[in-house]
UniProtKB/Swiss-Prot annotation:
It comes from Chlorobium phaeovibrioides (strain DSM 265 / 1930). This is S-adenosylmethionine synthase. PANTHER family: S-ADENOSYLMETHIONINE SYNTHETASE (PTHR11964). L-methionine binds at E58, Q101, D254, K285. Its cofactor is Mg(2+); K(+). GO terms for molecular function: ATP binding; magnesium ion binding; methionine adenosyltransferase activity. ATP binds at H17, D172, S173, K174, R245, F246, D254, R260, K261, A277, K281. Binds 2 divalent ions per subunit. Binds 1 potassium ion per subunit. It catalyses: L-methionine + ATP + H2O = S-adenosyl-L-methionine + phosphate + diphosphate.
Amino acid sequence: MSQSRYFFTSESVSEGHPDKVSDQISDAVLDSFISQDPNSRVACETFVTTGQVIVGGEVTTTGIVDIQKIARRVITEIGYTKGEYMFDANSCGVLSALHSQSADINRGVDRKEEIADEFDRVGAGDQGMMFGYACTETPELMPAAIQYAQRLVKLLAEIRKAGKIMTYLRPDSKSQVTLEYIDDKVARVDAVVVSTQHDPEPAGMSEAEFQAVIRKDIIENVINKVIPAELLDADTKFHINPTGRFEIGGPHGDTGLTGRKIIVDTYGGAAPHGGGAFSGKDPSKVDRSAAYASRHVAKNIVAAGLADKCTVQVSYAIGVARPVSIYINTHDTAKHGLTDEQIQEKAEKIFDLRPLAIIRRFNLDKPEGWSYQETAAYGHFGRENFPWEKTEKVEELKKAFNLA
C-alpha cells in the first residue's frame, strides 16, 4: 500500500507583535474589571500604532479601571520601553473610549430570576458557532505545528527578557513551522521560518555579517531547543529573517488591532474556527467561553482514548442558555468500535455547555492561578495551567462506555 504524504504549516507571533500588544492590553483591562466585579460585561478593543494606543468598547460593571496605567504596564512588560522603538510605554498617547454596554444585550444575557434552573437564567452573549479540537500529536494533545511555532517565539521572548545572550533582540517576532506527514503521522520538520526584530548592526559589522550572527544564534539557541532533534534532518530548511534587516517593527511597523490573530490563538489552522476572537471579552461571550469548553470536551475525549482526533462544534442563539447544536467528529479515528454519534450522546450528558455552567466549571469570572492577559500571547490552548486544559472527565467518559 502506498503511503500518503503531505505538508502542513502553522504560524505564531510573539507578545511584541502589534496585534498581540492589542490583545494583551484588552485582556489586561478585562482582568482589572473582573477582579473588582466578577459579573462585569466587557467587550474591549485596542488599536495601537506609532506612539498611540486607543482603547474602546462596551462595559457594564461596578469596577473602576485606570486605562492609562494598565496600557503602560502591559507595554512595559512586553518590552517597548525605548524611544527608538517609536512606541514607548512611557511616552505613547493612551486614549480611552469605553462606554456602557447596550441595554438590549443585557436584557437577554443577564439572569432571569423567574427561571427555576440557575444555569438556564444566563443566556449566550451572542449567536455563533465555536470549535474545539484535540489530537495525539503532542503530549498536550495539540497539533504539533502550532505548538512548535508558539514555543519558538515564546523562547525568543524569554531570551530577550533575560538579557544574557542575543542582546540585540527587540520585542516583535514571528515564527512558522512546516511539518511533513506520512500516513497522518508527523515524520519530520520540513521548514522553519523565524523573523525577529533586532537592533541596528554593531559598528564595524555589515548587514550581511550581522544577519549571519542572528541566523546562527536562532538556530542554536531557539530552534534546536524547541524542535525535537529527531524531526530535523539535512533537508530541513531554515528561513531566518529572510528579508534581511528587521529593525522597524511592533506598532511602529504595523498597526495592531485586538482579535486579528485568531488562528494563532487556537490550532494553527488544523481545526475549524467559528470566527469570533477571544481577547477583551468577558466569559458571558460564548465566542470565548464556549471555545474553551469545546477544547475541554475534545481534549477529554482524546485523553480518554476514545479517539486520536476530535473536533467539537457548539452553537448558540443570543439570550438562550442551551446550545442550539452540538457536533462531534473524530475523523475516522474513534476506537473501541465507537461511533461519533455514540460519543456525542454521552458527551452531551457529561459536559454542560450552558454559559453559566462553563463559567462556574472553569471559574472564568474569578481566575485563580492564571489571567486573561496570560492567554493573549502564545496560544489559549495546550498550556496546562489553564483550567479548560484539565482532563478530569476522562474516567467519567471511560465509565460511560464501560472502559474504566
